[in-house]
Structures are given as structure tokens and as C-alpha cells.
Amino acid sequence: MVINFEELHPNERVELERNIFFSTLEQLKGWARSNSLWPMTFGLACCAIEMMGVGSSHYDLDRFGSFFRTSPRQSDVMIVSGTVTKKMAPIVRRLYDQMPEPKWVIAMGSCATAGGPYVNSYAVVKGVDQIVPVDVYIPGCPPNPAALIYGINKLKEKIRYEAKTGKQVTNK
């Protein structure tokens, strides 16, 4: 069906312009992906308690379209919260590799972002970004659930921006 805009009444033209939008397939996929993130929780220390609070009725992460998954094969976001030891590093990498593409990582808390108070220990990895690429860093010891929700919203913005521009946003 072809619509000739010149033949329409001005009010009809305005109404039609309000109800039609143009987009690319990549932008549509980015919008859909950003509004249906399925995070996999990987809690290693006290930050995990705050991460669990996001799933409670007070914060209700479900209202943002995000549902916690227990399997990496069903997840597209890995939230690493807590101290990552060198013994745990291969497991983090294996879980990341099992996630389907596209996949994103959120480092939650001082320990996950830079080693935290245990940074000088021989057994602690100095940031999960040495094992897997991190998309969003959430500082704090421990960060509160509102900070995690803010970080998830920042990840959504990043996904939409990358879909719109076609440019990969990196933290390095």
C-alpha cells in the first residue's frame, strides 16, 4: 500500500507521522536486547548479598525486563560480584565461554573491579577484567542494590548506542 502524503489532510499527515517510525534491524535488535537482559549471578563474597537484594520485592529487577538465570547457556549478562581468586579464575572464564553471543559482563564491587582490600594477596586476581572483558564497572564495598540497577541501566544504554552507531564501546 502506497500513501501519497500530498493528498492527506494536514491533521492526518501529523497523525501518521506520529505513528510511524523508521529504524534499522540492528537498532531494533539493540532495543529488544537492552530491554530483556537475563543476568547470571556469580556471587563470590559480600557483594552477592547486595546482588540478591535486587531480586527482592523492594527493588524488583523484573520490572526492568531482567530475570536472573542459573545457567550460563540461558544468560546474556554475567554479574561478577566479590573477590575473584586465581583458583576461581578458570571457572569464571569457562562460564563466560558457555554464554551465547552477544554477552556482557558487569563487575560489581571493589573486589571484582580491582581486587578490593585483598589486592596485595598472592591469591587474588586484580580485577575480573584480566579474565573476561568487562562492560560496566560498579564501584563500592559493597555497592547497594540501587547501584546495581544503575549499572544495568548503563549497560542498556551502551547496548542501544552500539546498535545505533555500529561502534563498539570499550573500557580500555
Curated annotation (Swiss-Prot):
| Main subcellular localisation | membrane
What GO terms describe the biological role, i.e. biological process, of this protein? aerobic respiration; electron transport coupled proton transport
**GO terms of molecular function:** 4 iron, 4 sulfur cluster binding; iron ion binding; NADH dehydrogenase (ubiquinone) activity; NADH:ubiquinone reductase (non-electrogenic) activity; quinone binding
Q: What is its EC number?
A: 7.1.1.-
Record GO cellular component, one term: plasma membrane
Q: Does the keyword Disulfide bond apply?
A: no
EC primary class:
translocase
Q: Which cellular compartments is it found in?
A: Cell membrane
Amino acids binding [4Fe-4S] cluster: C46, C47, C111, C141
Which function does this protein serve?
Answer: NDH-1 shuttles electrons from NADH, via FMN and iron-sulfur (Fe-S) centers, to quinones in the respiratory chain. The immediate electron acceptor for the enzyme in this species is believed to be a menaquinone. Couples the redox reaction to proton translocation (for every two electrons transferred, four hydrogen ions are translocated across the cytoplasmic membrane), and thus conserves the redox energy in a proton gradient.
Q: How does it assemble?
A: NDH-1 is composed of 14 different subunits. Subunits NuoB, C, D, E, F, and G constitute the peripheral sector of the complex.
Q: What is this protein called?
A: NADH-quinone oxidoreductase subunit B
Taxonomic source organism = Bacillus cereus (strain G9842)
Q: Which gene encodes it?
A: nuoB
